[in-house]
Amino acid sequence: MNTESLALDFKSATLYAIRVVLHDADTTRLRAALDKRMADAGSFFENEPVVIDATRVDAPVDWPALLQALADHNLPPIGVVAEDANLQGARDAGLVPVELSTPVARAPQVIDTAPPNDVATPVPSVPEATAEAAAKAGPQDDEADGEQADEAPAHNPESVPTRAARETTEANRPTATPPQSSSALVITKPLRSGQRVYARHTDLIVIGMVSQGAEVIADGNVHVYGPLRGKAMAGARGDTSARIFTTQLDAELLAVAGVYRVVEDKLDRALHNQPALVRLDGDTLRIEALKG
């Protein structure tokens, strides 16, 4: 056997990344838009790999300035989709052209919700391994509401246009579907401001309050049996069939498969502080009341 071949090997890999879609080539406008998006999203997208999609702009992009703007927000670019002169400019700036494909949503499944431990283990960022509950914060201000949410959507849907250019994509064609866990991650303690929990390859169930400033993230569905006052993201790896369920909706930010809404104003009375679900309808985020 050739011992030199043991030093390394080549394997196929699937990489999930943020797709930053440019609608303008003006550096000032791009930086302002990026600043606002990141301020709205908090730490959701920090340190996530980025693929820049410049196919919608004809004007030349200032690639060094754009790359610096992304770096300032801890968004490392790993590739580009562009055409003609912009493609060459991106190459000159050190970007690698990539092909994008859309991930297939997983089929709905019955989740065994037997809890592991009450407290999840730390994780660096959204798409990394294991579950996370990080950072200390101030006191909680309410008790958890244990009322179960009925998953059948009722009336009073609120249609929300896409706010972000995050589309979870694949830089390479996948060779296998990521494994789905047989049980959901269950958290039975309220989450305080500054805490984050991430359920990898499964659903997340929080029995208690998610305070303002806390974040709950899952590759599958997010269930909050209590007031949801922080940020919630379902389908973190691009599962467009994922949903968010809560018995009391009062969130700062809602996201499914990267399509998100910052809740700057109070929701409709039929939704605010009521049982609700959040789902994707094409590229539109819908918030719907749940009837008991």
From Swiss-Prot:
Residues 171-185 have a biased composition (Polar residues). Gene3D superfamilies: 2.160.20.70, 3.30.70.260. Keywords: Cell cycle, Cell division, Septation. It comes from the Bacteria. InterPro entries: CAP/MinC_C, MinC, MinC_C_sf, MinC_N, Septum_form_inhib_MinC_C. GO terms for biological process: cell morphogenesis; division septum assembly; regulation of cell division; regulation of cell septum assembly. Residues 140-150 have a biased composition (Acidic residues). Residues 128-137 have a biased composition (Low complexity). Residues 107-186 are annotated as: Disordered. NCBIfam families: minC (TIGR01222). Interacts with MinD and FtsZ. Belongs to the MinC family. Cell division inhibitor that blocks the formation of polar Z ring septums. Rapidly oscillates between the poles of the cell to destabilize FtsZ filaments that have formed before they mature into polar Z rings. Prevents FtsZ polymerization. This is Probable septum site-determining protein MinC. It comes from Bordetella parapertussis (strain 12822 / ATCC BAA-587 / NCTC 13253). The gene is minC.
